[in-house]
Amino acid sequence: MVQIVSQDNFADSIASGLVLVDFFAEWCGPCKMLTPVLEALAAELPYVTILKLDIDASPRPAEQFGVSSIPTLILFKDGKEVERSVGLKDKDSLVKLISKHQ
């Protein structure tokens, strides 16, 4: 299941384990197209927590991590950024990106 986070709980949400964060905005077309891909990833890769952060409602984490284009996906391992992907990606590409850090 993909969960929505805010800037208030962002740091705690990425602190442990493997966490993929989708930095998105409600008005972003490619972001909307990415949602079913993330849902499929969540079902296929239960060892990864998948989160979505609305950069308009919660801008601080996006600023902190230098997110300037959306969708941006950042993979965190125990709170540290290990991978970044900008733009719409297919499920297979994201599985490869994540599996390197399993």
Curated annotation (Swiss-Prot):
Which Cys pairs are S-S linked? C28-C31
The record describes the protein's role as: Participates in various redox reactions through the reversible oxidation of its active center dithiol to a disulfide and catalyzes dithiol-disulfide exchange reactions.
User: Record's InterPro entries?
Assistant: Thioredoxin (IPR005746), Thioredoxin-like_sf (IPR036249), Thioredoxin_CS (IPR017937), Thioredoxin_domain (IPR013766)
Q: Which family does the record claim for this protein? A: Belongs to the thioredoxin family.
- Please cite one Gene Ontology biological process associated with this protein: cell redox homeostasis
An annotated GO cellular component of this protein is: cytosol
Pfam families, alphabetically?
A: Thioredoxin
Keyword set, alphabetical order: Disulfide bond, Electron transport, Redox-active center, Transport
Query: Which segments constitute the Thioredoxin domain?
Result: 1-102
Per the record, the domain of life is Bacteria
Q: Which PANTHER family match?
A: GEO12009P1 (PTHR45663:SF11)
Q: What is this protein called?
A: Thioredoxin
**Gene Ontology molecular function terms on file:** protein-disulfide reductase activity
Q: Which gene encodes it?
A: trxA
Q: Which Gene3D superfamilies match?
A: Glutaredoxin
The species is Chlamydia muridarum (strain MoPn / Nigg)
Question: In its keyword annotation, does this UniProt entry include Ribonucleoprotein?
Answer: no
